[in-house]
Amino acid sequence: MDLWFSESHTPDVKLSVRTEEQLFVGKSEWQDISVINTPSFGKMLILNGHVLFSDADNFVYNEMVVHVPMAVHPNPEKVLIIGGGDGGVAQVLELYPDIKQIDIVEPDEMLVDVCRQYFPEFASGLDDDRVTIYHQDGLRFLRNCDSDYDIIINDATDPFGHTEGLFTKEFYGNSYRALKEDGIMIYQHGSPFFDEDESAFRSMHRKASQSFPISRVFQAHIPTVPSGYWCFGFASKKYHPIEDFKKEDWKARQLKTDYYSANLHLGAFSLPRYVEDILEEEEEK
């Protein structure tokens, strides 16, 4: 008998993946968590019925949210990850020896334990000496920060449930305050491809643009996200993602990557016309 996992992306569109076995199912204080094994994507982590990542495409997300700001900021030493309980973002950050401190704010302890057991290739990023994990609410943590971080990466899942507060105007304002005078924030911007998702996409850009002097959007192809087209926000107090991109400096590091490259950095900010139109409309409001 064929077993399939299906995630609804819109009332008319689903992602369906053949499943070999269910490896874990549980309910934490914060969310439903399951892990399945699939022939096409390997293991998949599913939260509240939505795919968070898979073995096959998690590298795209992790590399983009890390290498883009790291190739722009001249001397980042302290990084804050909101979410990040799987360890994948931290694992990529650890390629940079000049980073001295990585703080991870992940409220869900069960999620961390599940990732350590079923995704050790990513969770190894949690074991670096520079990493400290705080099991508390991300917005509450930010309220107590003041000019502390060079880079903040909002690795929250989506603007619903217990992470809803991480997509509010208050969150962007608190992130601005938590950054040093030349700090950068990276956040999930979603996809505007489906009409059902466009309003959230607009709202995020509007809030970021109102909170930061520099607000840009970049893109990546991630097969398991809705539409396969995903965007990220680059919000900065000082540095522009293209004008201040240190291409040769980053290439000199000779880091091994599977998705990000210096050439891709430039292309990632060259958005489709319909996406540019949406962003420009929000900036004019």
Curated annotation (Swiss-Prot):
Biological processes, Gene Ontology terms: spermidine biosynthetic process
Keywords: Cytoplasm, Polyamine biosynthesis, Spermidine biosynthesis, Transferase
Catalytic activity reported: S-adenosyl 3-(methylsulfanyl)propylamine + putrescine = S-methyl-5'-thioadenosine + spermidine + H(+)
Transmembrane segment boundaries: none
GO (cellular component) term, any one: cytosol
Pathway assigned to this chain's UniProt record: Amine and polyamine biosynthesis; spermidine biosynthesis; spermidine from putrescine: step 1/1
Entry EC number(s): 2.5.1.16
Active site: D155 (proton acceptor)
Domain of life where this protein originates: Bacteria
Binding site for S-methyl-5'-thioadenosine: Q31, E106, D137, G138
Subcellular location: Cytoplasm
GO molecular function ontology, one term from the record: spermidine synthase activity
Main location: cytoplasm
Binding residues for spermidine: D86
PABS domain segment(s): 2-237
Stored InterPro entries: PABS, SAM-dependent_MTases_sf, Spermi_synthase, Spermidine_synt_N, Spermidine_synt_N_sf
Pfam families: Spermine_synt_N, Spermine_synth
Keyword Cytoplasm among record annotations: yes
UniProt cross-references to PANTHER family, sorted A to Z: SPERMIDINE SYNTHASE (PTHR11558:SF11), SPERMIDINE/SPERMINE SYNTHASE (PTHR11558)
Subunit and interaction comment: Homodimer or homotetramer.
Function: Catalyzes the irreversible transfer of a propylamine group from the amino donor S-adenosylmethioninamine (decarboxy-AdoMet) to putrescine (1,4-diaminobutane) to yield spermidine.
Record family assignment: Belongs to the spermidine/spermine synthase family.
Descriptive protein name: Polyamine aminopropyltransferase
Organismal lineage: Bacteria, Bacillati, Bacillota, Bacilli, Lactobacillales
Gene that this sequence comes from: speE
